[in-house]
Every structure is written in structure tokens, then in C-alpha cells.
Amino acid sequence: AGFDKNAEVYNALFRLGFGFVEVGTITPLKQYGNSKPRVFRLVEEEALINRLGFNNHGAKTVLDRIKSNKKLGLLGINVGPNKDSDNRLNDYLIGLRAFHEVADYITINISSPNTENLRNFHEESKLQELLTSILKEKNDLKSNVPIVVKISPDIDENQINLISEILLENEI
């Protein structure tokens, strides 16, 4: 996720030989993302800083694009909430509803430091509430699409262990 934010080049990536491609992060509504500049290169550290902020065309546009371009391989769809959403949990459910029939898996993105308070979903009670809602919606949709949860790369080992336990308890 992050390279093909709007599902515009996933088949070209498959033709290059990738075994799977993940598009997104896709939010329910189109969103510009953070103000530019939002990508910074640190030459001496050989690193990049990304402050994109889930810029994307929105679920409907991306879904229409995927439906009109038959995928040539395993396609994951990374979903997240709109920056100004009043109900972020519901935004994830909107993403699941939109993409469960066209995705080979759906990634629930709770990792972005660029979306205020998104990392609150790393907390035990909030993560459990999110997963319970996702699994209930998946059951209501009679969907078998696998769920992946993208967590932050800079959390400590205790948080990783706690999140891992919750994911395993929920069979994710």
C-alpha cells in the first residue's frame, strides 16, 4: 500500500512479476491528504519521511476502477478512515462493505501517524471493539475475505505482543 494508492497500476505491477499487490490506503470519501510538501528525502540517512495523509480518490471511484480492470493476481485493498471522520470505526466498515467482493484480502490500516488519533486503535479496548465490529460485518456480509491489520512499525515489544494476542484471539 502507498505505491498504488488509487488502484491505477496494479496490473502493471503484476506483469512485472509481483506475487500480490496491495492498493490504498482507501478512505470512504475522496481526500486530498496533507498539505505539500509531504514527502521528504534525508540524503545522508538514506531515508524518506512520508506525511501523505491517506490522499486517495475515495472508495466508490477506486471500486469502479477495480471492477473495470480485471486483476491479474492477488489484490489486497488497504482501507482507512477519512481524516475528518466523526466515526472512524464506521469508515473501516464502509471499506469492508465496498471491497469485500473484489479483494483477495483487506488490510485494516491503524498505523498512520499522519491521521490524528488513529493509533488509538492500538489500545486493547479500542482494537477489540474494531475487530468485533469488522468480524460482525464480515459475517453479516457472508464474506470469506481474509482480514489483515497494519500496525505501526515503531511500537514497543510489549505493544506488539498485546496486539498479536488480540489478533490471534480473533483469528486474524
Q: Can you describe what each PLM-predicted range is?
A:
Residues A1-I172:
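Flavin-dependent oxidoreductase catalytic cores
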